[in-house]
Amino acid sequence: MRCTRAIRQTARTGWLTWLAILAVTAPMTSPAWADDPPATVYRYDSRPPEDVFQNGFTAWGNNDNVLEHLTGRSCQVGSSNSAFVSTSSSRRYTEVYLEHRMQEAVEAERAGRGTGHFIGYIYEIRADNNFYGAASSYFEYVDTYGDNAGRILAGALATYQSEYLAHRRIPPENIRTVTRVYHNGITGETTTTEYPNLRYVSQQTRANTNPYTSRRSTASIVGTLVRMAPVTGACMARQAESPEAMAAWSERTGEAMVLVYYESIAYSF
């Protein structure tokens, strides 16, 4: 797989050096996804528990290509046919994304485009055998269809990746609690409230230890924007932001962000 301008821009220069070290050492180290699969995962969503506790989460479609999901191609700004529901094993990553959306509401109000009010939800979910590690599934895809050149950046991605893919659906019985975050645009006060899901079924389960075995993508050219930090994946977070907006988000959250572009990919996935 040949990529031109593989690393286009970094939000902070220090992360580029760290990424280069990581890319060299990744094949020799044990990445995060090699740990025990999580028993609990998290998802940010704008839908209230009145809906989610009743219906759970359902994927957009039946496209189970892992690469197209991780690059956002099958997500909302793409074809909207992904067969996966994105979750994260890191609550903090999910909180950072919620904070970003809340900050957007505040800035819109300052610009005269809204009230500044914001309501967002973080759902705590019991993972089971239907949840697959995004990074390990990506490695499986590279091993099956790609070549060794793709493993270097995949190793760097795996170190940051905290996304777990639920295939097709997350039933209400897997959703343990929801944390409601409300920001009052008038007073500036933010309140957080947790609610249990009365339909939740308590079991001792974990995410699948195996990667998801994906079909091969038919796309001949894939333009990929991978956010290395602090977000979890293209379908988990927003895909259409400019590098400037993403760098500004990085400054607000106190996190460094590395933007990696895979462009002009000659290899047909």
UniProtKB/Swiss-Prot annotation:
What protein family does this chain belong to?
Answer: Belongs to the bacterial exotoxin subunit A family.
Q: Which Gene3D superfamilies match?
A: Heat-Labile Enterotoxin, subunit A
**What's a GO cellular component annotated to this UniProt protein?**
extracellular region
Give the signal peptide as a residue range, or say none if absent: 1-34
Keywords attached to this entry: Signal
Q: What is this protein called?
A: Pertussis toxin subunit 1 homolog
Show the InterPro entries listed in the entry: Borpert_toxA (IPR003898)
Q: Which organism is it from?
A: Bordetella parapertussis (strain 12822 / ATCC BAA-587 / NCTC 13253)
